[in-house]
Amino acid sequence: DLFDYKPQMKEMYDKDLPASIRNGQRLTTMTSGQARFPIAPSKYNFSQFGQCGMWLNSDLLPNLGKHADEICWMRSLNTEAINHEPAICAMQTGNQITGRPCLGSWASYGLGSENDNLPNFVVLIATPTNRDQEQAISSRLWSSGYLPGEHAGVSFRSKGDPILFINNPPGVPDDLRKQTIDGINQLNRLNYETVGDPETHTRIKQYEMAFRMQASVPELTDLAKEPEHIFKLYGEEARKRGSFANSVLMARRLVERGVRFVQIYHNNWDHHSNVNGRMPSQCKDVDQPCHAL
């Protein structure tokens, strides 16, 4: 419906899918009870964009189409995965089986840090406008796998404090908080000498990063100084925490401050039904913000 233009499907409307297409592929429980597999073309219009001539859904993604020559379009990929989780895992890590580092972790591991006060790899989970059939997103998708844990993604929350416990408890000043962290880290170093678990060093670095983020995160997340034309560019939804537009704006601010890799998840694209009712809302969430970025 968005990127895979197949005009011939209009001529094949309601005809059965040829057996050569399925090629013996096993069925899922969602389709195993179907008596037939009729072909249904997209109901949207497609147009070619840019010098590359990429075909895109021009009804729902007109702004994204303006950047067709700036985007890497990969249309040669294939997978044997027939369900969401292994497919998502393969897209994030290159393998359907969990436990391998994701792309952001590799970027952190290979490139290092440009800002000691923010993580190398940040994850933002945007809330879709239409939340019908919304599915959970697991933190294992931004796991560092067999790489040191310090390279795992750090998820910023869309409500409350961006990072849990980033603020001092009531009545605890900064110097006391620093003394507490230093004491805990000293105990962790003693534990490492006894046990030798390398993840102990990860824990030490996490405590130290959390303390430094107390100063950097409030400035990062304060959008009050963003000029009005920025909100016109990204859309009014950019003012709403947790929206895709807000996440894209936050991603820009993170990258400007030296964060190596920012990944935004925008859920609820699993349209089993009412595609024409849900797809426009999803595309409206992402089209203008992606154009602005």
What is each model feature region?
Residues 1-293:
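Ligand-binding pockets and gating/stacking loops
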